[in-house]
């Protein structure tokens, strides 16, 4: 009887433990996601970054069964401030970042202390798209090739002025890379945004500039400016008749903006995989493809590992250029 009572006691304890386990399981094993997700865009509404985020947010909301809410945190620093804030968020999959080249590759070298390490503080989920910029001219120059422009720049005294939308942006560094590879001296003319540059370029106040496709399209269609070349290795689907800088005399020239989704480092891999799967599905839809192409961007579905490799490659490339030409951190 004593032995039977001991066994009954053990069975009771096991049953009690199972009950506690069942009660506790939902606290840590609830399916993801079970509440809305915040997607941080570290820049103001209306720009290319905002459009990229919203292009995929609706599709992700539908496939995940929870709302993906785009939140703009335009706190300055070319997006580095909002990026730093996201890096410090909980690694639970409920706060994501729209990361791009200027915050993940050029920002850490162009700003003295961004407060985050792109390689260590984030878990890449996948790329969304890549977008080239354009080498633009005022029509009065009557130049028809990159080689003609380089020849004019080499003979210019004082150095040729080149308009760029901001310091430390990919467009700014595209102009630096162009001068570096062409062996010419230029004077960068920074503007407070792409629209201000287009206004001055169309008015002839500056004769050459690097600018994104979407902001430049209306002035191009009105023939107020001329697209001499695209900054990607391959021609842009949005402007297939515009040659690339690489095919026009500077082999290997490549300066594009990459956009992608990231989570804070330490986010569980199953969550990363779920988000990557649904992101790739969103990029495969015709609706998202067309929306990205309107921005001059090419959809770029990748694995998390491929996304990480792009960040690493771009950071190495741009930091090497920044240091080799002696650009100073702000």
Please annotate each region the language model reported.
Residues 88-94, 109-196, 245, 256-291:
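Hinge/capping helix and adjacent helix->loop/strand transition within the periplasmic-binding protein
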Residues 103-113, 176-181, 208-242:
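A ligand-binding cleft/hinge motif common to bilobed small-molecule-binding domains
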Residues 10-23:
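Bacterial N-terminal signal peptides
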Residues 34-36, 180-181, 247, 269-330:
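An extracytoplasmic/periplasmic, membrane-proximal ligand-sensing/linker region
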Residues 28-120, 159-161, 167, 183-210, ...:
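N-terminal (or domain-start) structured segment
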Residues 1-13:
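Bacterial N-terminal signal peptides that target proteins for export
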């Amino acid at each position: 009887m004593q032995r039977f009572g001991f066994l009954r006691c053990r069975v009771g304890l096991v049953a009690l433990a199972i009950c506690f386990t069942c009660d506790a399981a939902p606290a840590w094993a609830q399916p993801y996601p079970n509440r809305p997700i915040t997607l941080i865009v570290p820049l103001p509404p209306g720009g290319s970054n905002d459009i990229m985020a919203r292009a995929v947010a609706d599709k992700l909301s539908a496939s995940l069964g929870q709302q993906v809410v785009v939140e703009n945190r335009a706190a300055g620093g070319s997006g580095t401030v909002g990026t730093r804030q996201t890096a410090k968020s909980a690694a639970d999959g409920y706060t994501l970042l729209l990361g791009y080249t200027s915050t993940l590759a050029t920002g850490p070298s162009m700003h003295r202390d961004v407060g985050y390490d792109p390689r260590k503080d984030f878990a890449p989920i996948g790329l969304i798209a890549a977008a080239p910029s354009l080498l633009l001219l005022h029509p009065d120059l009557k130049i028809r090739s990159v080689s003609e422009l380089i020849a004019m720049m080499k003979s210019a005294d004082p150095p040729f002025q080149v308009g760029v939308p901001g310091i430390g942006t990919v467009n700014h560094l595209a102009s630096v890379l162009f001068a570096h590879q062409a062996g010419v001296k230029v004077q960068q003319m920074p503007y407070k945004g792409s629209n201000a540059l287009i206004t001055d370029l169309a008015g002839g106040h500056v004769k050459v500039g690097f600018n994104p496709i979407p902001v430049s399209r209306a002035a191009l269609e009105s023939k107020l400016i001329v697209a001499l070349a695209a900054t990607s290795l391959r021609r842009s689907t949005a402007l297939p008749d515009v040659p690339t800088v690489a095919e026009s005399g500077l082999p290997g020239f490549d300066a594009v903006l990459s956009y992608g989704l990231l989570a804070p480092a330490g986010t569980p891999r199953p969550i990363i995989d779920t988000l990557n799967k649904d992101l790739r599905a969103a990029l495969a839809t015709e609706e998202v493809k067309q929306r990205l192409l309107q921005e001059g961007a090419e959809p770029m579905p990748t694995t998390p590992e491929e996304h990480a490799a792009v960040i690493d490659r771009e950071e190495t490339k741009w930091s090497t250029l920044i240091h080799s030409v002696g650009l100073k951190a702000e």
